[in-house]
Amino acid sequence: MKHYKRALLASLASMVFVIAATQALAQAPADNSKIAQMQGADRQQRLVEGAKKEKELTFYTSAPVDDMAVLTEAFEKKYGIKVKVWRAGSEKVLQRAATEARAGRFDVDIIDTNGPEMEVLHREKLLVEVKSPFLADLIPQAILPHREWISSRLNIFTGGYNTKLIKKEDLPKSYEDLLNPKWKGKLGIEAEDFDWFSGVIGELGEAKGLKLFRDIVATNGISVRKGHTLLTNLVASGEVPLALTVYNYKAEQLKNKGAPIDWFAFPPAIARPNGTGMLRRAPHPHAAVLFFDFMLSDAQELLLKRDFIPTSKKVKTPLNQMPIKFIDPRVILDDEAKWSKLYQEIIVKQSK
């Protein structure tokens, strides 16, 4: 399971050399609030001049390598600034950033990962607000009150189905339709999607929603698989005819390659924000601010071309075509124990 608080505590517990960490902190880059919050007509010029001197930046991300390569290459071409990328799962991104900071090591400039992990970094005071002019272009839900990380794109949980095994006209219209015996042995779900579960149950009503999913699992069974990429591939292969929680962009990417897969939404579709944030002690602050701006501007069109859902209002996306409910990462972080336990008890442990 994704235990955000536990992951953070584990990373902090590993720091045993307190004296060495304190000495390292004294040599750390300065707080970059002034650069991050720079405004004015000459802002862009000052950022570019500073970034040219810094020459590079370091970027931690949990997004797929191929997708992020498109963005970093475009940034490098535009500014001539080298982007050093380290990619891992969202939990490992969080652990590495927190561990390095506690050790007084500040290598990373920008982090891009799931909303709950970004919220932990905010609460640990590792991020800084960037007063980007491109914030005005984003949907309101992309901007949290503290503004220390911004949702640059969304992971939208959708249903995925194998088009050779299931006809579009036969798809379920609601979660209640999943009680139909025709779905027996055909359903699949990802093993750690308790945040999706909390959003769906919130829409259905807690008592009604929990009973419904208990009944669905008891009646028709459900196959639990770890990893959205694996689950999506199993839908395409036909091993899982219908999955409840695939990311729409993953299904779209396979569909565009000719795989027999498509996606649909149970209204409202549940959306998890993915965020971008600048580190308060980024070693390359001017380059970091430029990259932050880039993620909210030029990168939005590039993300769309990679079948992601960007948050800019200037980009036409499925946001305009379906009702969407946004998961609040602050709520998920605070209520993780409750929803993780319910998801395990009702879905994972009862899976067939």
Residue ranges and their predicted role:
Residues 298-352:
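Extracellular/periplasmic juxtamembrane helices and adjacent flexible linkers that interface
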Residues 58-72, 84-101, 106-239:
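Extracytoplasmic ligand-binding site segments that recognize negatively charged/polar headgroups
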Residues 10-21:
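Bacterial N-terminal signal peptides
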Residues 158-165, 201-203, 272-287, 303:
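A bilobed periplasmic-binding-protein/Venus flytrap-type ligand-binding module shared by bacterial periplasmic
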Residues 24, 137-141, 154-155, 183-192, 213-218, 222-225, 294-315, ...:
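Periplasmic-binding protein-like
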Residues 26-58, 76-77, 179-184:
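Immediate post-signal peptide segment of exported/extracytoplasmic ligand-binding proteins
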Residues 117-120, 241-260:
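A ligand-binding cleft/hinge motif common to bilobed small-molecule-binding domains
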